[in-house]
Amino acid sequence: MSIEFKNVSKKLGNNIVINNVNIEIKKGIVTGLKGINGSGKTMMMRLIAGLIYATKGEVIIDGKVLGKDISFPPSIGLMLENPAFLPSYNGFDNLKMLASIKGEIKDEKIDEVLETVGLAAIDKKYRKYSLGMKQRLGIAAAIMEEPDIILLDEPTNSLDASGQEMVKEIVAKEKESGATVILSCHDSALLESMCDEIFNIEVGEITNHYVPDKE
């Protein structure tokens, strides 16, 4: 699915958190959002997901305006920073509860995504998860429905080198399947290694757009 921001601004109270953003994200590529904490990366993801709507301008998903033509994208997986799950449930049960909302995801698919993120053999309750395990479960939740749009906000936080490689492999696989992937990451080199294009964000404004050199 393609995504377009047309003259998009967002105010929270008296603060302008996104200011006149105009970008187009093509279908089936990996796009990075680069910037310091509070720059507007997460806010842009929330706008794409339909969790909030633009104060001015339009966020357009495949030609349809969010908040006007559609309430939210029809096929989207989202992992915002610090994902929250039920503390008394294990990973499988948390994902099964989410899957039950649509009732279209089989137990075998849940087992598969837990295997993909390295949590298949772990039966701990979520409250006993390490930060890295919580990140892994958040990624699993974002990809288990095989969505057309995948938003990953700082997916490599709290992950060791092997976990970061796992994220790279997942992103590459989702791109190969045709998904539009948008992610943020504090590590510029890691972000560039995963992305086809990167938008730099400062104080809610796009200040640069470039294609990473991967040679």
Give the residues covered by each predicted segment.
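H-loop/switch region of ABC-family ATPase nucleotide-binding domains
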Residues: 185-186
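Catalytic Walker B motif of ABC-type/P-loop ATPase nucleotide-binding domains
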Residues: 150-154
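The feature captures the beta-strand-to-loop junction immediately N-terminal to the Walker
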Residues: 34-36
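Conserved ABC ATPase "signature" region
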Residues: 96, 107-122
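Conserved ABC transporter NBD signature motif
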Residues: 57-72
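Helix-to-loop junction immediately C-terminal to a conserved catalytic motif
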Residues: 49
